[in-house]
Amino acid sequence: NIMVLCVSTDGGKSFRSCEAVVEHPDPQCRIYDPCLWIDPHGVLWMSWTQARGFNDGRSGVWVSQCSDPDADNLVWSPPRRIANGIMMNKPIVTSKGDWLFPTAIWCDTSGSVPTERHGLENEQFSNVYASLDEGRTIALRGHADIPHRSFDENMIVEKRDGSLWMLTRT
């Protein structure tokens, strides 16, 4: 399968298709859950998940960045893998400047038994990956252990007092 980015310049009345196409050369690799985010510097991040089959027990969040999203011809960085798991919602930037990426690796009890083992059982949670250098490096920070979870879809919100909420649909 492929992921296609379409662009509208008239408020959504029409779209130019194929501004960006993500396609994996391996037909067994699935590309899904795209997400667009403009960071505080105006850089457009296009993220997606890749996995072998439906659930390979690892998945992976990939990104490509466009430094000038208002250009007529969008130029994208080479794709890079930033996290294990799936990211269905946008990152946030906290008041301290940390960039937080909500990801998840589905647990073995999700009803979708992983087809492979990667030693990531300690990451089968609703996770937070963080960057302290504006996205140049990103690492696992922590997780929430949601009872009776299956297909986690999590997001992070910073409250006025600086504490964080993780909202998870499972």
Give, region by region, the residue ranges found by the protein language model:
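Asp-box/BNR beta-propeller blade signature and adjacent active/binding-site loops
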Residues: N1-T170
